[in-house]
Swiss-Prot record:
Name recorded for this polypeptide: Probable Vpr-like protein
Disulfide bonds, paired cysteine numbers: none
GO cellular component labels: host cell nucleus; virion component
Organism: Feline immunodeficiency virus (strain San Diego)
Primary localisation category: virion
Higher taxonomy: Viruses, Riboviria, Pararnavirae, Artverviricota, Revtraviricetes
Compartment annotation: Virion; Host nucleus
Motif (Nuclear export signal): 34-42
Keywords assigned: Host nucleus, Virion
Placement of sequence motif Nuclear localization signal: 44-53
Known role: Seems to function as a Vpr-like protein, since it mediates host cell cycle arrest in G2 phase. Cell cycle arrest creates a favorable environment for maximizing viral expression and production.
Length: 77
């Protein structure tokens, strides 16, 4: 739960592509390393204003990632 909360805070300051990349990376890293990465990003982006164009919460990034996967599988088929 802590990971999702920190991810949401970081993602609101990123563009859509960067948020999806962090989402994918989140599934490849150990929990402790991911939390340290997200806290570092949150510190680095602390003065950047939130971008409100797209919702980039954990669940929306999951949806965007699934859409991207289905698009890529259709294109390669």
């Amino acid at each position: 739960m802590e990971v999702i909360r920190i991810f949401n805070k970081v993602a609101e300051r990123l563009d859509k592509e960067a948020a999806i990349r962090i989402f994918v990376l989140a599934h490849q890293l150990e929990r402790d390393k991911l939390i340290r990465l997200l806290q570092g990003l949150l510190w680095r982006l602390r003065f950047r204003k939130p971008k409100s164009k797209d919702c980039l919460c954990w669940f929306c990034c999951r949806l965007y990632y699934w859409q991207l996967q289905s698009t890529l599988s259709i294109d390669t088929a």
